[in-house]
Swiss-Prot record:
Keywords of this entry: Chromosome, Cytoplasm, DNA condensation, DNA-binding
Name of the molecule in the record: DNA/RNA-binding protein Alba
Function: Binds double-stranded DNA tightly but without sequence specificity. Involved in DNA compaction.
A cellular-component GO term for this protein: cytoplasm
Gene Ontology MF annotations: double-stranded DNA binding; RNA binding
Organism: Methanocella arvoryzae (strain DSM 22066 / NBRC 105507 / MRE50)
Length: 96
């Protein structure tokens, strides 16, 4: 999947990410991935749910991947950070 169909969720308001996802689907993307780490995970889940329930009701969750990434802190210690990838897709009938 091309990297331009990936939305990296950070600290901005949820509606910014919702708009990005809706725009990608409206431009013809068949699948959009929402990625987040740490505290932004709940914002990524909110983004996927708002897209599905309020804007594009034909969009489905294809799959969800969760993982843990090991990062180095400012002090040099290793810390574990959770991450999530939510794969949204539109059924064929809606895009053809």
């Amino acid at each position: 999947m091309p990297e331009d169909n990936v939305i990296f969720v950070g600290n901005k308001p949820v509606m910014n990410y919702v708009l990005a996802a809706v725009t990608q689907f409206n431009e013809g993307a068949k699948e959009v991935t929402i990625k987040a780490r740490g505290r932004a995970i709940s914002r990524a889940v909110d983004t996927a749910e708002v897209v599905r329930h309020r804007f594009l009701t034909d969009v489905e969750i294809d799959r969800i991947q969760i993982s843990t990434e090991e990062l180095a802190s400012e002090k040099g210690e290793k810390i574990n950070v959770s991450s999530i990838e939510i794969f949204l897709k539109r059924p064929r009938a809606a895009t053809d």
